[in-house]
Design a protein with these regions (language model features):
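Short beta-strand segments
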Residues: 13, 46-48, 71, 109
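Short, basic, helix/turn surface patches
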Residues: 37-44, 96-102
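A glycine/threonine-rich phosphate-anchoring loop and its flanking beta-alpha core
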Residues: 57-140
Length: 140
């Protein structure tokens, strides 16, 4: 087994905002994949919150009709919701999440140690999603 570092081809950092959740960001990511000759056996890895996961998952799902994808969510909300739901989406001028696909990640790595850096608001958002899911599940 080769060390992971030997297999890393490119790291792309972007500001995770609603503005960057766009076709432009997807195009940048996919151009990096093309430039580095990613094929269907290669894997795109997302490390970040929900926006990062959405953009990366959509990029993976539409690049060469789908490549492997691993999500490493760094927020509680992403760990309990968007990283495991299989819905990917980006925004356009008509609204949020109007372009997307259904694409389950090949793996999700949820490390609770990543949550230590979150502010109170981020933690509350995650707990609110947990509560919402619990209430909906118990109602059904």
């Amino acid at each position: 087994m080769r060390p992971l570092k030997a297999d890393l081809k490119k790291i792309y950092l972007f500001n995770p905002s609603e503005k960057s959740k766009s076709q432009k960001t997807v195009e940048i990511i996919q151009n990096i994949l093309f430039k580095n000759r990613f094929n269907r056996d290669d894997c795109l890895i997302a490390f970040g919150g929900g926006i990062t996961g959405d953009v990366a998952a959509y990029s993976a799902s539409t690049y060469k009709r789908g490549i492997k994808f691993v999500n490493i969510p760094t927020t509680l909300l992403a760990q309990v919701d968007s990283s495991v739901g299989g819905k990917t989406g980006i925004n356009n001028s008509y609204g949020k999440n109007l372009i997307g696909s259904f694409y389950q990640p090949d793996a999700v790595v949820s490390d609770i140690n990543l949550l230590k850096s979150l502010n109170t608001r981020e933690i509350i958002c995650g707990y609110a999603e947990i509560l919402k899911s619990s209430l909906l599940d118990s109602y059904q």
